[in-house]
A protein has these predicted regions:
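Cysteine-dependent hydrolase recognition
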Residues: 1-468
């Protein structure tokens, strides 16, 4: 799928948990933010009167299922499709989506035609319609065709500053203009960019952007919640960490070096202890080296450590590996791969991300010698939609031992190359939720394959095949 059909990337579809890796480099220094001087005492630059502030509104009311084929019912693809992702609730023609953005601190003397509006919205029914967007009651962008399940990602530039007729708030309304009362659309996100003063609304963290300036910048920020502690300005472009000057009451001042970067990104963070997250523990992580031949196999078993014990100390997952390595089981070089390890290495630590499996299988196909012949997943899986909407339930982890791909769920896509829908290596799954179920399956598999491989053609040995 094209990344252009992704709506907004503010919220993850897979999990609400973030993992951070602090790496050790034995041959050099890792990247660090460099403490940088803030020479306000000798400043000769005038204070910047405004910056172009972007206020974003992201919606997380529902997981929109995206493009559907309407054949008596709505049928969806397991691949991530147009319009799939977090959105607002469905919006019907009678009642558009309205949002008031407060505390905008508009700079009234700013450039007169420099307001930008962006919107990402999607149709949610098989009806013709146009997308209609209004700022302070004034339509912007004209009537934008968005029929059926089509997606629109629009940027409307050079709007007049006068459209923001209040210095303190912006009213936005978004709707579809279908004549059918039951029509539906959904909005993923929108934003408004406009000239604003350096009033940071008593926030403890404030992200902002500046354009290039070959002379440098002098910033005088007001109404920032520093609680009497010098805040820290992070310069993302330059990798700098600058301590704010709070010697003047009610102000945080910075002198920034000249820059030719077209767009510079900053984040002002309060240094107050109440604004810090305490890390109570760290766990050591040494990645498994899958380039090592000893860690490669041609029968890949992907499972969850929870299934490695049936409650009596028996690891039926490993017994299954032993069976597949035996003559009766096919004489494979069977290996068990821990889903937690794959999440960390191939899913960038993102729990439940399908890339953990898909990218590992791609890697195995390209690097293992010999290449894998089969992939067998041991452990139940849930579609991302079912897991995400229920991840606060303790049972969700028990029912989602090894993640699958998309909604509706598809293990085949875990084994498919990007942009394809056929497996690069045969793949299957045992949807077990405990080690005992793995043992029961293993016993049945042994019996089945023993009978299957038997050369006997007697009625006594083949009668079971007539039992339906």
């Amino acid at each position: 799928r094209s990344p252009d059909i992704q709506m907004c990337d503010k919220y993850s579809l897979e999990t609400d948990t973030a993992t951070y890796f602090l790496t050790v480099n034995t041959v050099g220094s890792n990247l660090r933010y460099l403490a940088t001087a803030n020479p306000t005492a000798g400043n000769v630059l005038p204070a910047e009167p405004y910056f172009m502030r972007r206020i974003e509104q992201h919606y997380k009311s529902q997981i929109n299922k995206g493009y559907a084929a309407v054949i008596g019912e709505y049928v969806y693809s397991a691949s991530y499709d147009i319009g799939e992702g977090w959105t607002s609730d469905n919006i019907v023609p009678c009642c558009g989506l309205s949002k008031v953005l407060d505390n905008i601190n508009k700079y009234t003397a700013g450039p007169q035609n420099n307001v930008t509006f962006t919107v990402t919205a999607v149709g949610n029914a098989l009806n013709p319609r146009e997308l209609v967007c209004k700022i302070q009651g004034t339509q912007v962008g004209g009537l934008m065709p968005m029929p059926y399940f089509n997606l629109r990602k629009d940027t409307i530039r050079n709007l007049p500053l006068s459209i923001l007729n209040s210095p303190s708030f912006i009213g936005v309304n978004i709707n579809g203009n279908s004549t059918l009362a039951t029509d539906r659309i959904a909005v993923s996100c929108f934003s408004v960019t406009y000239p604003a003063t350096f009033n940071f609304n008593n926030e403890k963290n404030f992200y902002f952007e500046l354009k290039d300036n070959t002379l440098g910048n002098y910033l005088v920020i007001t109404n920032f919640n520093s609680n009497g502690v010098a805040p820290i300005l992070y310069d993302y472009n330059g990798g700098k960490r600058i301590l704010g000057d709070i010697s003047v009451a009610g102000q945080v001042r910075f002198v920034l070096a000249p820059s030719t970067d077209t767009l510079r990104k900053f984040n002002l963070i309060s240094g107050d202890i109440s604004n810090s997250q305490s890390v109570t523990s760290l766990s050591s992580k040494t990645f498994v080296n899958y380039a090592n031949a000893a860690n490669q196999g041609n029968y890949i078993i992907i499972s969850n450590p929870i299934l490695y014990n049936n409650g009596s100390g028996v690891n039926n997952v490993d017994l299954y590996r032993q069976y597949r390595s035996s003559l009766a089981g096919g004489s494979f070089n069977a290996k068990v791969y821990n889903i937690d390890e794959l999440n960390d290495q191939f899913g960038f630590g993102i729990k439940k991300h399908p890339s953990a499996l898909r990218d590992f299988i791609i890697y195995a196909n390209q690097q293992f010698n010999p290449a894998p012949k089969y992939v067998f997943i041991i452990g139940r899986g849930l579609s991302y939609l079912d897991y995400t909407l229920n991840q606060a339930n303790p049972l969700a982890e028990q029912l989602d031992m090894v993640q699958t791909f998309g909604w509706p769920a598809s293990d085949v896509l875990l084994s498919s190359l990007p942009g394809t829908s056929y497996p690069s290596v045969p793949i299957g799954r045992l949807g077990a939720i405990n080690g005992t179920e793995v043992g029961i399956y293993l016993d049945k598999m042994k019996q089945y394959e023993q009978v299957q491989q038997s050369p006997s053609q007697t009625i006594e040995d083949k009668a079971w095949m007539k039992n339906v």
